[in-house]
């Protein structure tokens, strides 16, 4: 089995004016495609790992051959992270129900959660991701470097938990529209969060 670039469930301009068409198209067809290609190349002679869903593969990086660990950490990680990211974007959804109640329980309020998430995203030095994760029965905000995922575990990524929501803070995700204004990009994210997808991920793991 080889990995393939997932189709987006919306047009490249569907998130305008918050996320621009040109960035979405380049991000998906160039950056994400490169992670897919590189992951497949690294897995060519590793059928026991190539057969795994990418979300499972990145939980088993300590089992892959040492000379493939870094390339798969970066590129299988990039494929997994972006696949989640695209599904987590949609205009017009509302935070409600069990996920909203859990956020209010664990952060005190939705505004407190957003402030903590924005801080994690804005202060991640260089490239990386901010995440809302479920750890056991508690929600938490974490961030990871590069294409690391909380699914990789603390020993590799410095974070753990099941991702409910993720935001890409690599410059390629926002530079064409926002240049160096990462905080502005982060603020716009709230206008395109697919809360239905986040709620479904939460319900599947709670």
Curated annotation (Swiss-Prot):
Homodimer. It comes from Salmonella typhimurium (strain LT2 / SGSC1412 / ATCC 700720). One of its GO terms (cellular component) is cytoplasm. This is Superoxide dismutase [Mn]. One of its GO terms (molecular function) is metal ion binding. It catalyses: 2 superoxide + 2 H(+) = H2O2 + O2. Its EC number is 1.15.1.1. The lineage of its organism: Bacteria, Pseudomonadati, Pseudomonadota, Gammaproteobacteria, Enterobacterales. NCBIfam families: PRK10925.1. Gene3D superfamilies: Fe,Mn superoxide dismutase (SOD) domain, Iron/manganese superoxide dismutase, C-terminal domain. Belongs to the iron/manganese superoxide dismutase family. Binds 1 Mn(2+) ion per subunit. Destroys superoxide anion radicals which are normally produced within the cells and which are toxic to biological systems. Mn(2+) binds at residues 27, 82, 168, 172. Keywords: Manganese, Metal-binding, Oxidoreductase.
